[in-house]
Amino acid sequence: MIARVWRGSTRAEDADEYAAYLEETGMETARALRGSRGTLVLRRSHGGQAEFETILLFDSLENIRAFAGDDIEAAVFFPEDDRYLVEREPTVRHFEVDVNVT
């Protein structure tokens, strides 16, 4: 299993709305794909901002390509992201999942 990890930040006052938007766009899209093993959205507030870390779990790199396209290192953005994000990583990190306890 492979974890796809991305980070971005919103203004604190936009955090709840962005979390709902993120769920409706990226998270639902990822979970609907073959080979998806689930998603996590982590949030923490600090300095007037809310930092989001997303973790998408996939069976293989081919499954990630179905979500991200050929450049699997590039982050995937949706139309309203510019409205919310004050900071964002343009790339993602991929990790092999060594331990999965459910």
Each model region followed by its residue ranges:
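Non-catalytic surface loops within mature trypsin-like serine protease
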Residues: A12, F58-S60, E96-V99
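Short amphipathic alpha-helical segments
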Residues: A12-G38, V76-D81
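Short acidic, gly/pro-rich beta-turn/loop elements at beta-sheet edges
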Residues: D16-Y18, I64-A66, T102
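Alpha-helix boundary recognition
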Residues: E23, R31, R65-A68, V86
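Glycine-rich beta-strand-turn "strand-cap" elements at beta-sheet edges
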Residues: L40-A50, V76-T102
